[in-house]
Amino acid sequence: MELDIKGIMERLPHRYPMLLIDRVLEMVPGKSIVAVKNVSINEPFFNGHFPHHPVMPGVLIVEAMAQASALFSFTDDNGGLKADAGKTAYYLVGIDGARFRRPVVPGDQLRIEVEAERLSRTICKYQGRALVDGQLVAEAKLMCAIRSLEE
C-alpha cells in the first residue's frame, strides 16, 4: 500500500519541522515499509548544520526511520487507521548499531526501508536502513514503545 502526505499526517502526530516522511512507496502492515524523505536546502537544520557545508544530522535520519516504523503501529492489517491510534503514543526508546556511511545533503532523496523484527502490544523492534541513489547511507536497529495516552 502507498500513502501520500495526507495519509501520513493522519497516522503520525509529527508536524513541520519534525515530520520527516514525505511519502510511503510501499507498506505491508506488520512486516515492512519503504518511505521517502526529500531533503531540501530549505530544511531548518541546515541553517546551523553546517552553513557552508550542509549535512543532514544523523540523528534526524534515525528519527525518519523511527517515524516510518511508527506508521506500522497506526495502520491495521487492511491498510486503514487503527481504532486506537489517537489514544496511543509511540516512543523511540532504543537505538543499537547505528552506522552512518556517507553524508546526506540538500537535493538527496532519502529512501527509508524498515523491517519489523518483533511486534507486540507494548514493544516493537525494527531494522532500519536509509539509502540515497541505491547507496546505503545509514542503518540502525530501533526499539519503540507503545503507550496509552491515558496512562
UniProtKB/Swiss-Prot annotation:
It holds the Pfam family FabA. InterPro entries: FabA_FabZ, FabZ, HotDog_dom_sf. It comes from the Bacteria. Transmembrane segments: none annotated. GO terms for molecular function: (3R)-hydroxyacyl-[acyl-carrier-protein] dehydratase activity. It catalyses: a (3R)-hydroxyacyl-[ACP] = a (2E)-enoyl-[ACP] + H2O. Keywords: Cytoplasm, Lipid A biosynthesis, Lipid biosynthesis, Lipid metabolism, Lyase. Belongs to the thioester dehydratase family. FabZ subfamily. Involved in unsaturated fatty acids biosynthesis. Catalyzes the dehydration of short chain beta-hydroxyacyl-ACPs and long chain saturated and unsaturated beta-hydroxyacyl-ACPs. This is 3-hydroxyacyl-[acyl-carrier-protein] dehydratase FabZ. The lineage of its organism: Bacteria, Pseudomonadati, Pseudomonadota, Betaproteobacteria, Burkholderiales.
